């Protein structure tokens, strides 16, 4: 319960901060499309720099302490933004430095918490635990942008970071109060490099994980592009306000919350394999409606909202399913490294996807760029249909693969 509460607070703060960053860069610092793509890339660049070592370190350390330390670092970095704004010294470079620090902290927090869940929940309940944490993420998506949009309507965008810092304080307090005993990390005399190589060899040799790893990496590249283009579509092409953007994103998260709750129904009726394929492809296809809304400006807000709700619903079912499958397959001593490798695949390619999306949008226009990146995401989803994971007919981690 404390982990769930802490993650809910952290996700709300993250979403408020993400909206504030977009608003500051676009409206206050007047950043170009390319600069916005670079700023978004810096927030995930840390996974390329320390993603793999972080997994090995987390396997050596107590996960709860790692999460607390990461939160304290984020709090310190976040409070520098409103301070610089008050002193009239806020620059795009400062914003980029903070984004990089937040990215580094997020690497350790995310790897630790994904590795912590299987240690405090039995394998039978890993799916339920992940569903609850994903519901927290969707609560953050639903409440964060709306709260952030409302806040940015009454205070300057840089001051919104104070609320983000406050949510990380709440998250730290909740995690600190967890009393479930954490198993002592397995001690190893192996070097850091040897442990990283062991983790890579495990994923590479696992016939379900490795093909899934490749498809997830490709999908993450495309999703990063879509994510950086949507605020440009809403704020610049459709001339909506930051408040409206926040409300649109919040509405979309309702679908994600419902997806986290109804995932067991999908698994019971379709099994893991077909659930992975169907929900991923549908979840990406409906995004096509968002750039198409340019041609119906009077209905654009409704089109983007409905598309966001549907996409979030299906992709949440998919994400919880693939995450739970990975955790059930992986032995406990490898959890940190396995999660770090997948995070490396997802977040490591996202800086490239974000940056490329900014360049493509600058040359072809936002609408064409969104169509292109949506097509890439669909291709990645179709590829999953040809992996061993798609042939899992059961609802457990040791199913029969036909």
Where are these regions (language model features)?
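Hydrophobic alpha-helical transmembrane segments
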Residues: 92-103, 125-183, 250, 302-305, ...
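Hydrophobic transmembrane alpha-helices of Major Facilitator Superfamily
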Residues: 12, 16, 104-112, 221-225, ...
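Hydrophobic alpha-helical segments of secondary membrane carriers
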Residues: 6, 39, 132-140, 215, ...
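C-terminal transmembrane bundle of multi-pass solute transporters/carriers
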Residues: 1, 48-52, 60, 64-70, ...
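Helix-loop boundary and gating motifs at the non-cytosolic
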Residues: 1-46, 201-252
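Hydrophobic alpha-helix/TM-entry signal in multi-pass membrane transporters
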Residues: 2-7, 67, 95, 138, ...
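Juxtamembrane intracellular "pre-TM" segments in multi-pass secondary transporters
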Residues: 1, 180-214, 402
